[in-house]
Amino acid sequence: MTDITTWIDEYHKGSRFGLNGKILFKKTSKYQEIIVIENEYYGKALMLDGCWMTSLKDEKYYHECLVHPALSSIDEKSNVLIIGGGDGGTVRECVKYSKISKIDLVEIDEEVIKISKKFLKEIAGEAWNDKRLEIHIDDGVKWVEKTKDNFYDVIFIDCSDPSEFSNLLFSHSFYKECERILAPSGILATQSESPESFKNIHINILKSLKNIFKVSETMYSFVPIYPSGIWSWTFASSEDLSLSKQNYDEVVKIEKGCEIWNLNFQNAAFKMMPNKIVKELDS
């Protein structure tokens, strides 16, 4: 759009995280304001409604942590649902697995996909063309409601922070519907916000999943572009989770293509729950 550089900031409770660079794209879609900026250090970055979503520099911290703990523990052919994920990073990580039979990506805002393909094509690349992928421009909540019981083996909730059009993706009723459409041994994997910047939302997510599913586990790591830098991902199942019992040969293969995730990283990340979160969950 222009060669003039400017600061773009995300504000949160009296703090801010900003990037300085050239604005490559700016538009208000039916659902949200979309900005793409190019920064010297983080590369191209995507902001939705004033919140940083991803950047080329640190997106693998997020996408690898969301996908691989779940998919590396699945042994059989699987149907996968991605709710959100319009930047393509979750799709890219999913298509690394030959055992995935089908991927449904449900994104409410088609503009996010279009813009990501044009300005952030380094994220997903050819993954957009994988024959197993079907893209649906739809409301994720409504998609889940109309899906038959036990249909998906893995569900990824790759959504933005709570907002007017995404609040229901964090609700107890929505997680309950996800449990209904999962296969008996299926896994729900969701980004579960920051235990620091979004502590109350984080606690509510963990409590809901603990109440609905037989077992849930949360891992913590870093996404530098997000408020406070620390983030979380939670994995839940109606049967015993086997997140530490991966197929060794497959893990070795997947690790070679990852920048952040490996089994040692994962095992440590599942042991990083801050004690203040432990206390609130036990109260």
UniProtKB/Swiss-Prot annotation:
GO cellular component, one term: cytoplasm
GO biological process: spermidine biosynthetic process
Entry's localization field: Cytoplasm
PABS domain location: 5-238
Residues binding spermidine: H63, D87, D158, C159, S160, D161
Recorded metabolic or biological pathway in which this protein acts: Amine and polyamine biosynthesis; spermidine biosynthesis; spermidine from putrescine: step 1/1
Molecular-function annotations in GO: spermidine synthase activity
This enzyme's EC code(s): 2.5.1.16
Alphabetical keyword list: Cytoplasm, Polyamine biosynthesis, Spermidine biosynthesis, Transferase
Residues holding S-methyl-5'-thioadenosine: Q32, E107, D139, G140
Catalytic residues in the record: D158
Disulfide bonds: none
Enzymatic reactions: S-adenosyl 3-(methylsulfanyl)propylamine + putrescine = S-methyl-5'-thioadenosine + spermidine + H(+)
Record family assignment: Belongs to the spermidine/spermine synthase family.
Stated role: Catalyzes the irreversible transfer of a propylamine group from the amino donor S-adenosylmethioninamine (decarboxy-AdoMet) to putrescine (1,4-diaminobutane) to yield spermidine.
Subunit comment: Homodimer or homotetramer.
UniProt cross-references to HAMAP family, sorted A to Z: Spermidine_synth (MF_00198)
Name of this protein: Polyamine aminopropyltransferase
Organism of provenance: Prochlorococcus marinus (strain AS9601)
Gene of this entry: speE
